[in-house]
């Protein structure tokens, strides 16, 4: 946009289209530029992305608002520190520190959710159909299941395999698998199974080196579990994996594979594996070597008050040997858990999904191709209805200091420095004046309080002519 005050002309170029408007500009002292909704003429406006607002005068750059880092609704320009105010903004940079809800649903029917990491697609599997949610655009497709059944109709027992492009419904206690071909719209299992799961809230992860899914622990029928299972892609059988020494039974721990080892963090349970005994959180990181079958405690934290009810998976960050995991603390919060030290830190703002639930599918997913992390919270309430919410957060992750805009000290106006100097100088004079007044008052009081008589002398002056 170019303002020609001399010729009363505004030239606007938008989307490679030029527009010229004749407006009385001579004598104008202030100009307000609004991007988005106009408070004077329109009530609705389509959302738009804005960045890099620049103002030039006679070819010189006098203002530049990047609209990236900010302080609440205020953004400072890079030239003079001038303020730009946004009304009800949605800052894209905040998507790197805050979870954004991309889907919500309440339903009374049975539901399970799986994720396709390659295409960022969610599969919401119901009894006779599958809804496919695009995690990027938010678009929804539907397919009708023509025949067959999943092996488990409860939450937390569904995965998507990107190698075969199939949905896997699995039952750990029955060691059965049913495959859904999206193209053929058919489950491979011909008989319906209605058994309740024995392994609610188990940890799960995928091992690319042997193309297998691994599942650990869980809860069901008043017992905590510590069994380890494997499902190799392309087979229809789940097999148990032996290891020793045994890890204490638990549920709601997070799992990831690094090299030959399966790592487990957090969870809740007890050594006996029975609900009648007191349960507690496990503030520890354990590992199972999948080649040797040997388990170990990597580290254990003695005291903590954090809630270590974790999403079923976590993801390894090799740059600093840490894991990204999600805790139920504060209704959902992303943590960085360090492999070589008993430390975890919060790296996102909490979601605060504090709805009370009876059961929950709490699943954490990563889509590296789209540079996004996703979280599924499927809360089953006491009336057995589902309250489903799906959240996303962008990577790389940022912290508050990286999105907060700090005013450049070099941009402070000169008059402000003069004003500060005058205030300081005036304060110094006032301070000295008070000290002198204090001394004079003290001398006067000393004279008045003395008992020595005061003599008065009279002088007569004469002037000789």
Language-model segments: residues:
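Conserved blade-ending motifs and adjacent loop-strand segments that build the rim/top face
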Residues: 247-249, 297-312, 341-368, 405-410
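Flexible glycan-contacting loops in extracellular carbohydrate-active proteins
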Residues: 20-51
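Extracellular glycan-interaction surfaces
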Residues: 1-24
């Amino acid at each position: 946009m170019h303002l020609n005050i001399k010729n009363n002309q505004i030239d606007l170029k938008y989307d490679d289209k030029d527009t010229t408007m004749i407006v009385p500009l001579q004598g104008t002292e202030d100009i307000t530029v609004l991007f988005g909704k106009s408070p004077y003429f329109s009530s609705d406006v389509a959302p738009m992305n804005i960045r890099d607002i620049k103002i030039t005068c006679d070819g010189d750059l006098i203002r530049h608002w990047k609209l990236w880092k900010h302080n609440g609704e205020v953004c400072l320009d890079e030239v003079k520190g001038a303020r730009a105010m946004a009304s009800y903004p949605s800052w894209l940079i905040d998507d790197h520190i805050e979870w954004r809800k991309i889907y919500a649903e309440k339903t009374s029917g049975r539901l399970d959710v799986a994720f396709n990491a390659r295409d960022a697609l969610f599969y919401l599997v119901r009894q006779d159909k599958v809804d496919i949610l695009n995690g990027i655009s938010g678009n929804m497709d539907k397919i009708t299941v023509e025949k067959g059944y999943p092996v488990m109709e409860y939450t937390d027992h569904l995965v998507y395999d990107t190698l075969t492009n199939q949905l896997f419904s699995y039952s750990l206690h029955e060691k059965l698998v049913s495959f859904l071909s999206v193209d053929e719209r058919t489950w491979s299992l011909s008989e319906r199974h209605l058994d309740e799961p024995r392994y609610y809230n188990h940890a799960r992860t995928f091992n690319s080196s042997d193309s297998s899914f691994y599942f650990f622990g869980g809860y069901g029928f008043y017992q905590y579990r510590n069994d380890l299972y494997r499902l190799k892609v392309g087979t229809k059988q789940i097999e148990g994996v032996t290891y020793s020494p045994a890890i204490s039974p638990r549920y709601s721990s997070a799992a990831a594979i690094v090299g030959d080892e399966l790592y487990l963090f957090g969870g809740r349970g007890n050594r006996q594996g029975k609900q009648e005994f007191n349960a507690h959180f496990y503030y520890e990181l354990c590992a199972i070597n999948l080649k040797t079958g040997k388990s170990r405690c990597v580290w254990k934290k003695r005291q903590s008050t954090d809630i270590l009810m974790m999403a079923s998976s976590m993801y390894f960050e090799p740059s600093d040997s840490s894991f990204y995991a999600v805790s139920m603390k504060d209704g959902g919060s992303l943590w960085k858990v360090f492999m070589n030290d008993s430390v975890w830190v919060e790296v996102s703002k909490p979601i605060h999904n504090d709805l009370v639930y009876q059961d929950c599918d709490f699943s954490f997913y990563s889509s590296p191709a789209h540079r996004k992390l996703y979280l599924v919270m499927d809360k089953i309430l006491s009336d057995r209805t589902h309250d489903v919410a799906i959240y996303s957060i962008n990577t790389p992750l940022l912290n508050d200091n990286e999105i907060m805009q700090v005013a450049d000290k070099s941009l402070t106006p000169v008059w402000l420095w003069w004003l500060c100097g005058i205030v300081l100088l005036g304060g110094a004079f006032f301070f000295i004046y008070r000290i002198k007044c204090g001394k004079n008052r003290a001398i006067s009081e000393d004279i008045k309080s003395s008992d020595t008589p005061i003599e008065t002398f009279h002088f007569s002056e004469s002037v000789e002519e």
